[in-house]
């Protein structure tokens, strides 16, 4: 028996975030960082970032490079990236990318 069409659903947010994942991953690798996904992608895209090579850029520069993927070749002065601290010394950058779609990038170090 075929599935009822109403039973087949797609999380549109997950599909939206999945479409940009490879660009984010490659950007992080170019900056000397490794990234991994965490969470359901139901509301935002939670990314765990860790410096992977000795020459990795700072966390702030990684975030700026990722923002360039959505904002062209330069960071807009009014682009709102908010930084915060979480438990166990974790730092997080929240990047609004469109409407209520966000990237939350977390790291245990700022790699200065």
Where are these regions (language model features)?
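Catalytic core of pol beta-like nucleotidyltransferases
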Residues: 1-43, 50-112
């Amino acid at each position: 028996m075929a599935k009822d069409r109403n039973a087949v659903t797609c999380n549109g947010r997950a599909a939206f975030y999945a479409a940009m994942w490879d660009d984010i991953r490659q950007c992080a690798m170019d900056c000397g960082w490794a990234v991994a996904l965490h969470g359901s992608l139901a509301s935002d895209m939670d990314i765990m970032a860790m410096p992977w090579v000795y020459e990795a850029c700072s966390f702030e520069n990684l975030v700026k490079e990722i923002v360039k993927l959505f904002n062209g070749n330069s960071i807009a002065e009014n682009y709102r990236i908010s930084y915060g601290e979480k438990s166990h010394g974790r730092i997080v950058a929240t990047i609004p990318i469109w409407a209520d779609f966000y990237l939350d990038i977390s790291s245990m170090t700022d790699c200065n």
